Amino acid sequence: IPAPLQTFIDYIYRAGVTFSYNENGPVGLVPDKKVIILNARGGVYSTPEMAPSEMSVNYVRMIMNFFGITDIEEVIIEGHAQYPDRAQQIIADGMEDVKTIASRLAKVTV
């Protein structure tokens, strides 16, 4: 994952703030949060053969689950370097997915 994202995770990974422990183990303290994971990767890691090598989305999802967050959406743009002839379409499709999620978020009232 990018260093700034890892730094952010390091800052919010705080006992008593985002998680705590009880007699049964760790307990997430921010289950009311929503997370959207945006990930672009040049290769394709969603296939059964490559999935074990995917270490960014799975890592971020695991950390968020540790904090108690289960409302997680993903937009993954993958394969644009592996398939340069389809790169523009792959990226355009991913950006449409981002716009769809963003428009849904814009309609959320607090």
What residues fall within each predicted segment?
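Helix-loop-strand module that forms the ligand-binding subsite of alpha/beta enzymes
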Residues: 1-60
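Glycine-rich phosphate/pyrophosphate-binding loop and the adjoining helix
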Residues: 47-110
